[in-house]
């Protein structure tokens, strides 16, 4: 982790430990990346994103390489963190189940906004159905 050089080594370590604790990995602090599972590596990435207390976290397929159980855990952790830290999350995903947990879903087709859903105005099941229809329409999945 990189910090401004005006921050002491002790303070940097304290922030790193705190971030790892927040994602449940303080006990794995001295492990190498190849000694961590995919879910643990994603949680380390989340911890790194929290170090400077950002107002926005950008996540590109944060659960893309994870099994469904690990994906759920990572998404619950992200939701908890953004709520606790008053942070916003902008996420790219192809997983409709994850997309329907958002407050807002923006569908892109060929790099252009196709639809913009606010989930407080529309039920999550309706959004899931619309996303399934879109996937069928653009050929990502069989109809």
Located regions from the model:
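Hydrophobic anchor residue at the start of the ABC signature
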Residues: 46
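Helix N-cap at the start of a conserved alpha-helix in ABC-type nucleotide-binding domains
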Residues: 68-70
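Catalytic Walker B motif of ABC-type/P-loop ATPase nucleotide-binding domains
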Residues: 57-60
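Conserved catalytic motifs of ABC-family nucleotide-binding domains
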Residues: 53
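ABC-type ATPase nucleotide-binding domains, specifically the catalytic core motifs of the NBD
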Residues: 1-11, 22
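Conserved ABC ATPase signature
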Residues: 32-36, 40-42
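Conserved beta-strand-loop-alpha-helix hinge in the C-terminal portion
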Residues: 112-137
């Amino acid at each position: 982790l990189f910090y401004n050089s005006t921050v002491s080594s002790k303070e940097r370590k304290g922030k790193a430990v705190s971030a790892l604790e927040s994602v449940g990995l303080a006990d794995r602090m001295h492990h190498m990346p190849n000694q961590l599972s995919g879910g643990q590596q994603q949680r380390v990435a989340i911890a790194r994103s929290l170090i400077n207390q950002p107002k926005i976290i950008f996540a590109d397929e944060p659960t893309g390489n994870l099994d469904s159980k690990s994906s759920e855990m990572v998404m619950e952790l992200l939701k908890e963190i953004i709520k606790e830290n008053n942070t916003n999350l902008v996420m790219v995903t192809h997983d409709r189940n994850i997309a329907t947990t958002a407050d807002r879903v923006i569908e892109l087709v060929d790099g252009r906004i196709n639809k913009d859903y606010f989930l407080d105005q529309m039920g999550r099941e309706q959004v899931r159905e619309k996303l399934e229809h879109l996937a069928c329409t653009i050929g990502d999945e069989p109809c």
